[in-house]
């Protein structure tokens, strides 16, 4: 047969352009020209991202795979465009029609984040790539095992960019016949239209084309047949078109069905129904799909053998925006899979469904994680939704959970996949004592709604109301939330409303080749900001607002979640920006959008948390936190620098430098998105020192008033880079760390400081001072019954620190319980490198011994006081409201410096006076009320006098 091109699975239809490239040799150009001329014979039917030569490939012959990256739909494929090298095939072979297409993989194909040399692609120019392979040899499939299909994708060497998966069907060595035009097995056409038919066979044969059993044309000993087919004029009428190839010894057939586009009935929605699945009774449901600008929609599923006919044609509402249908005669408790067949060409699930079935990924979910998972029929090739009447409600044990106050939250950010061996809710349930002992009072789950594939961080959402089955059943999730509530732990969901991946029905339904169409009710054609990865929601669209509000209401009411973290909340805008400098500027439109969502959430649950990943300018965050929302406060870089002994500033762990009125900054040293502190520290420090310095960082971070967050396993000193196996790839699970004595001490220090924070009222005070910018960091908190100071030396050398304590009397070292009687506020204390302390004026229960190596403060170095400077010096009045007068001995010579410091040792003012004066006047009117120190200095001579500003 002729060297035709084969077209296989992809989700959209395009025309392929194959211009010659200047990068090819003259000989190669000639070969390509012949190839293109052969191709051009069937040019009108070409248009898929993957084609093959020959047209009907089999497993035992060499085939050429040709990729056109301009036609790939995965958003991550954009990173492959324009490349001339560093593109690789990642592929597999499957032995069954319905099983895993990656069942057999080539030797050496093990790490997606590394180049796979055997799969190195050849550039054809203009974003087209090719590779030649013989499937049976390439995938090392035994001769007695059939190869039914190939699963293929292209990726960059480091795996950061990739196409979606494509499926290539392989044929056996017998006579085969197929339609190249039309491509679809079933499709719709306008009444009275004509369509072109092109069939090819794997060898010369007698070919016959029939329509509804009636012969319309034949050829003799040819390998192709062309025909123009006249479509019926009857609405909804179907025609079965069949091609038969016959040789002296074999017969092969293939067919497609074309149906005349129907005209739907117009009818108003039944009272009380809403978009999605409406359960009317144990035997009846009403399905409603919001689908403006669509011509007709069929409901297909288990209940009608996946057939589109007049009975399954959905009614259209008078405004043309919705389609609906009643399904009756259902069996209580039975799961039914279904899809909407939109305009006769696109089958999608219900955007509001609570469960999906995915023919390409579900078989990769273990029966341990999700028992008795239903599978789709072999002929259903795309995601379907599930409905089930008469479901048994989960028996909640906790129905009136009292949430921790926002300013008292200690959040544990958690990724189910990388938390334990099976990556399931069941694993998390089994570890509840771990969370309880750690002391956290909130768990923030990285996205758990259905995302593309089974292995992901979850920021590629496709069905926003369906929990992803890769982690377990919906009741497993509910049990985990219920158990958290039993143990005083709130649960927050990380939700992704800035973008959706291609498999989201409302992306696919309004699609224009490689991007959302201009008439999409939900999506911008191009993202309005520089950080979008997939397809960008338009949050000014009412359709988007309605969908997001429904999703937020659903998770609160159905799963009793305690709130949300909005991923990339800065992206909730229609304001155009090309870089972060523009993107982060105050945006009233974004504020209005977020306020609307927040108000709706609080109408569903008056105490629900809303945390924003915003990172906009302070003025905007001030406005939103004034409304009651919280914002992420990333200090990862400073935390890593502090542990390593480099310059760092922890000041913005506090809400005060941000100008917030309330403690609404969720400070964190690590998150899913940041490099791990311990990995970075171990580049320059040994493990023992790095663990101790991590304790110091925790002490200075966690004791700042306001909500805090830690990333999973930071409490054990997790030291695997975020970039290992690709940024979002699976990471090794190190539960063995919990058995390591030194790492266990870090966990226990986390536990003690977290419990200190959540149990002591002093951490809710607004009366606190932070001095967190230097290598020695200090902080002081005060309330009516207690005072607390924390101090840490992040230098790599010993430091002497003055004015640690703000008041005289008894202070108690938290980790040793040792009492220190402070009798001189000017005392200097020596802190070793990495040493930290937490002191309180109220004695607290002492933690387990030896969690930290530091002895109580007490290595005292008295300040040098020269007798010549001391004689005759006076400071009055003391206390004072406005002015203080200082008398210095008349015989002092040179210059005298008078400095005022606060109780944290911070310099507030400095005045230089010429010696010889007897009296000096200092204005203190601008100082807040409190205790201060006047330092009189001349050369190496120094005298400190305490005074009080009224």
Regions found by a protein language model. Name each.
Residues 1-23, 43, 862-876, 880-950:
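C-terminal outer-membrane/trafficking sorting elements
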Residues 146-152, 237-241, 334-336, 837, ...:
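Exposed beta-strand face motif in extracellular beta-rich ectodomains
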Residues 259-297, 349-407:
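Basic K/R-rich, polyanion-interacting modules in nucleoproteins and related proteins
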Residues 353-362, 371, 394-563, 568-586, ...:
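Substrate-binding/active-site clefts of carbohydrate-active enzymes
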């Amino acid at each position: 047969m002729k060297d035709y091109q084969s077209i296989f699975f992809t989700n959209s239809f395009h025309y392929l352009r194959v211009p010659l490239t200047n990068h090819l040799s003259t000989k190669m150009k000639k070969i390509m020209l012949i190839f293109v001329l052969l191709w051009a014979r069937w040019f009108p039917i070409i248009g898929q991202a993957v084609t093959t030569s020959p047209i009907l490939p089999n497993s035992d012959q060499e085939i050429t795979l040709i990729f056109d990256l301009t036609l790939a739909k995965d958003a991550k494929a954009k990173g492959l465009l324009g490349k001339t090298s560093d593109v690789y095939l990642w592929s597999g072979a499957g032995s069954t029609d319905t099983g895993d297409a990656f069942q057999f993989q080539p030797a050496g194909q093990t790490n997606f984040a590394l180049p796979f040399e055997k799969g190195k692609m050849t550039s054809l120019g203009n974003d087209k790539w090719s590779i030649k392979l013989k499937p049976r040899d390439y995938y090392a499939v035994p001769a007695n095992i059939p190869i039914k299909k190939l699963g293929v994708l292209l990726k960059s060497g480091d795996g950061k960019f990739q196409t979606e998966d494509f499926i290539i069907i392989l044929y056996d060595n017998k006579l085969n016949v197929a339609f190249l035009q039309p491509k679809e097995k079933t499709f719709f056409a306008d009444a009275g239209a004509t369509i072109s038919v092109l069939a090819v066979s794997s060898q010369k044969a007698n070919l016959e084309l029939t329509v509804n059993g009636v012969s319309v044309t034949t050829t003799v000993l040819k390998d192709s047949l062309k025909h123009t087919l006249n479509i019926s004029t009857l609405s909804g009428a179907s025609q079965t078109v069949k091609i038969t190839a016959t040789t002296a010894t074999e017969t092969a057939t293939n067919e497609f069905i074309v149906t005349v586009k129907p005209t739907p009935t117009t009818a108003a929605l039944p009272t009380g129904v809403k978009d999605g699945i409406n359960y009317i009774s144990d035997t009846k449901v009403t399905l409603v799909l919001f689908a403006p600008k669509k011509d007709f929609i069929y409901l297909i599923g288990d209940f009608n053998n996946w057939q589109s006919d007049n009975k399954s044609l959905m009614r259209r509402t008078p405004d043309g925006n919705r389609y609906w249908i009643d399904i009756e005669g259902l069996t209580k408790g039975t799961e039914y899979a279904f899809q909407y067949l939109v305009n006769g060409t696109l089958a999608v699930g219900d955007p509001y469904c609570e469960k999906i079935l995915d023919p390409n990924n579900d078989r990769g979910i273990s029966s341990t994680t999700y028992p008795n998972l239903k599978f789709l029929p072999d002929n259903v090739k795309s995601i379907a939704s599930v409905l089930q009447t008469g479901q048994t409600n989960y028996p909640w044990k906790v129905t009136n959970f009292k949430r921790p106050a926002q300013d008292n939250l200690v959040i544990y950010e958690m990724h189910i996949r990388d938390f334990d061996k099976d990556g399931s809710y069941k694993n998390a349930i089994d570890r509840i004592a771990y969370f309880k002992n750690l002391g956290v009072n909130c768990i923030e789950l990285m996205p758990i709604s259905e995302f593309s594939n089974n292995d992901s961080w979850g920021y590629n959402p496709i069905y926003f109301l369906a929990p992803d089955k890769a982690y377990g059943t919906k009741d497993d999730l509910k049990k985990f939330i219920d158990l958290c509530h039993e143990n005083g732990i709130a649960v927050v969901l990380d939700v992704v409303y800035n973008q959706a991946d291609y498999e989201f029905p409302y992306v696919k339904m309004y699609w224009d080749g490689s991007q959302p169409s201009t008439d999409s009710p939900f999506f911008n054609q191009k993202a309005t900001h520089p950080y979008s990865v997939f397809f960008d929601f338009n949050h000014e669209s009412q359709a988007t607002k309605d969908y997001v509000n429904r999703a937020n209401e659903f998770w609160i009411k159905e799963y009793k979640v305690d709130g949300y973290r909005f991923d990339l909340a800065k992206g909730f805008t229609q304001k155009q920006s090309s870089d972060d400098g523009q993107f982060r500027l105050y945006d009233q439109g974004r504020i209005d959008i977020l306020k609307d969502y927040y108000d709706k959430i609080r109408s569903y649950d008056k105490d629900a948390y809303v945390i924003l990943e915003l990172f906009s300018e302070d003025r905007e965050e001030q406005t939103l936190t004034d409304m009651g929302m919280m914002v992420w406060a990333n200090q990862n870089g400073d935390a890593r620098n502090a542990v390593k002994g480099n310059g760092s500033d922890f000041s913005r762990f506090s809400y005060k430098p941000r100008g917030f009125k309330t403690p609404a900054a969720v400070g964190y040293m690590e998150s899913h998105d940041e490099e791990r502190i311990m990995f970075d520290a171990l580049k320059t420090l040994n493990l023992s020192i790095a663990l101790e310095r991590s304790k110091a960082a925790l002490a200075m971070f966690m004791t700042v008033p306001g909500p805090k967050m830690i990333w999973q396993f930071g409490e054990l000193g997790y030291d695997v880079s975020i970039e290992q196996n690709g940024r979002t790839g699976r990471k090794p699970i190190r539960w063995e760390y919990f058995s390591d004595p030194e790492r266990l001490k870090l966990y226990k220090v986390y536990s003690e400081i977290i419990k200190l924070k959540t149990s002591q009222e002093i951490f809710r005070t607004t009366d606190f001072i932070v001095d967190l910018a230097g290598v020695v960091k200090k902080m002081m908190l005060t309330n009516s019954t207690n005072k607390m100071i924390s101090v840490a030396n992040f230098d790599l050398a010993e430091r002497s620190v003055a004015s640690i304590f703000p008041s005289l009397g008894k202070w108690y070292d938290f980790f040793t319980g040792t009492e220190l009687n402070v009798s001189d506020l000017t005392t200097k204390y020596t802190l070793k490198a990495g040493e930290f302390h937490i002191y309180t004026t109220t004695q607290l229960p002492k933690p387990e011994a030896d969690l930290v190596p530091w002895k109580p403060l007490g290595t005292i170095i008295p300040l040098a006081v020269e007798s010549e400077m001391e004689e005759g010096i006076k400071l009055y009045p003391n206390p004072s409201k406005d002015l203080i007068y200082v008398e210095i001995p008349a015989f002092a010579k040179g210059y005298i410096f008078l400095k005022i410091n606060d109780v944290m040792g911070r310099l507030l003012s400095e005045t230089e006076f010429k010696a010889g004066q007897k009296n000096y006047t200092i204005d203190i009117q601008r100082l807040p009320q409190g205790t201060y120190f006047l330092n009189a200095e001349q050369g190496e001579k120094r005298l400190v006098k305490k005074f009080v500003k009224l």
